[in-house]
Amino acid sequence: MSSADVITLPKLLSKVPEIFGNLPGLIKGSKMSKITDTNTPLGLGVAFEKATDSNPNGVAILYEDRELTYKQFNAWANRIADYLASIGLKKGDTVAVDVENRPELLATVLGCAKLGVCSALINTSQKGKVLTHSFNLVEPKAAIIGQELVEVIQEVRDDLDLKQNFFYFADQDTLADPGTAPEGFTNLATEIKDCSSENPASTHQTFLRDPLFYIYTS
C-alpha cells in the first residue's frame, strides 16, 4: 500500500500514545521486540488484558476531567469489539476511524485490535479528494466518525465506496452521555451499552505479523 504504513506490534512499542501512561505490558518493549514466534498470541489486546489483570484499579486514562481505570477502559473496548463482531466484522477487516485524539479514539483502536480488525487512522486534517482517497484506499467495512469530523465526511460521502456502517461518537464523554447521532449515522455509544464487557476469545487469535492500524504518510 503506497500511502499507508502498516503498524504491527514491534513498531507499536515505540509509538504508544502518552495518554496510556504506564501500561505494564508495553513498557517491556525491549523484551517484546525480540519475539519472533509468529504463533504466539500477542498484540495490543493481549497486552492490555494482561495489564488489566495485574492492575485493574490503576488509572489507565487521564484526559481533561475524565479518569478511567484499566478495568473500566478494558470493558469499554470489549463492548466495542462485541458490537463490531455482531455486525459481521472479523479478523482481517479494516475500519476507517476519523476521530480526534480523545479516549473514544483509543477505545476504538483497542476494541478493533481485540477482533484482529485493523484501524485505518484517517488524518483528521484531510478534506475533499485527499480524504476520499485515504478512505477508499483501505476498503473499510465500517467507519467510526467523531462529531468533530462529521461535516467533512458528509462533504465527500457520495464519493466514498462505503455505503453503510457509518458510526458516530459525540464529542463529549460518551460513557456518561452518548449524545444523538445525525441522520445517516448510527450512535456507537448507544449501540454498545448492552454488549458484553468480557474479554473476547478473538484477542488471542492475533499474532506478531497481524496489522494493528494504518497511518497515512505523504
How should each PLM-predicted stretch be described?
Residues 1-41:
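Flexible, non-catalytic linker and terminal segments flanking ANL/adenylate-forming cores
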Residues 2-15, 86-87, 114-191:
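Structural core segment of the AMP-binding/adenylate-forming
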Residues 20-30, 46-69, 175:
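AMP-dependent adenylate-forming
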Residues 36-44, 57-102, 106-110, 127-135, ...:
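Conserved AMP-binding/adenylate-forming core of the ANL superfamily
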Residues 40, 44, 145, 181-184, ...:
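Residue-level signature of the cytosolic catalytic core of signaling kinases
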Residues 49, 81, 132-135, 203, ...:
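Short hydrophobic/charged patches on amphipathic alpha-helices used for structural packing
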Residues 56, 167-170, 183, 193-216:
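Conserved pre-ATP/AMP-binding loop-to-beta segment of ANL
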Residues 95, 112, 143, 211, ...:
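Conserved S/T- and glycine-rich ATP-binding loop of Class I adenylate-forming
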